[in-house]
């Protein structure tokens, strides 16, 4: 953003973190999160011999083939293609590439939208699929439904005063979920059910019959669907 950090200090153990910028400004916060991103380790692989530029992400198609390599014989999976820098997505891409190579064409397309991700903070933050803004940018007519995660009986097993929000992004035309975000303790364990619902394009009226156990965080499903009007 055009700003240079001069120094970062915490005056006391329980005090705020203060970030001092080179232009004289300073900002205070409870904690400081450093997220500088990652650079692809594609140097010294001989990529230049096949027309690729070393040190950059390798652009691939939905079958994980490098698009800039003639005859598309080179596959790139995992962090090196820059699609989703997550271990589980790298493993998924490897399975897709293997199915393509073996001729199992029913699984030869890697989804770029259904990417589950978890931030292991306290409380946890997790999401899968599209955000509301991403969905609208694609021309989808979406509705957002939210519910307080801490209001679910299962949340009380983590203690009183639990805070967090659960949110669904719903495609109004197809009545399916295209995105979901959860915050709160233990919500990462709910994420896979949302991933299945999005990847399978399961209609909301079918999901209504998926009964969550009491008392678990999964009961947030019921409240979200009720909030939608089911």
Region spans (language model):
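Flexible, glycine-rich terminal cap/loop adjacent to redox cofactors
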Residues: 121-230
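Glycine-centered tight beta-turn/hairpin loop motif at sheet-sheet or coil-to-beta transitions
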Residues: 22-24, 161
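FAD-site-proximal beta/loop scaffold in flavoenzymes
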Residues: 26-104
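Short, hydrophobic/aromatic-rich segments at coil-to-beta transitions
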Residues: 15-18, 141
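Short, acidic, Ser/Thr-enriched surface-loop or helix-capping motifs
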Residues: 21, 61-62, 171-172
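Active-site-proximal substrate-binding core of FAD-dependent oxidoreductases
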Residues: 82, 100-131, 211-213
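Flavin (primarily FAD) cofactor-binding/catalytic cores of flavoenzymes
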Residues: 3-6, 65-67, 130-133
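A conserved short coil-to-beta-strand element within the FAD-binding core of flavoproteins
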Residues: 1-14
């Amino acid at each position: 953003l055009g700003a240079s950090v001069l120094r970062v200090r915490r005056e006391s153990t329980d005090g705020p973190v203060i970030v001092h910028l080179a232009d004289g400004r300073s900002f205070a916060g409870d904690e400081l999160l450093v997220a500088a991103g990652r650079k692809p380790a594609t140097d010294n692989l001989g990529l230049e011999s096949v027309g690729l530029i070393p040190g950059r992400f390798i652009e691939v198609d939905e079958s994980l083939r490098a698009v800039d390599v003639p005859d598309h014989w080179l596959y790139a999976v995992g962090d090196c293609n820059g699609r989703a820098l997550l271990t589980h997505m790298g493993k998924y891409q490897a399975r897709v590439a293997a199915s393509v190579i073996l001729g199992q064409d029913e699984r030869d397309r890697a989804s770029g939208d259904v990417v589950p991700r978890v931030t292991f903070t306290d409380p946890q933050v997790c999401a899968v699929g599209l955000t509301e803004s991403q969905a609208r940018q694609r021309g989808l007519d979406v509705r957002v439904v939210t519910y307080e995660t801490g209001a679910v009986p299962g949340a009380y097993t983590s203690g009183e005063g639990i805070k967090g929000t659960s949110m669904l992004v719903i495609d109004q035309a197809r009545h399916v979920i295209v995105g979901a975000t959860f915050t709160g303790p233990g919500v990462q364990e709910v994420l896979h059910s949302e991933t299945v619902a999005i990847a399978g394009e399961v209609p909301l009226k079918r999901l209504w019959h998926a009964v969550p156990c009491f008392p678990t965080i999964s009961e947030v499903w019921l409240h979200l669907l009720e909030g939608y009007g089911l």
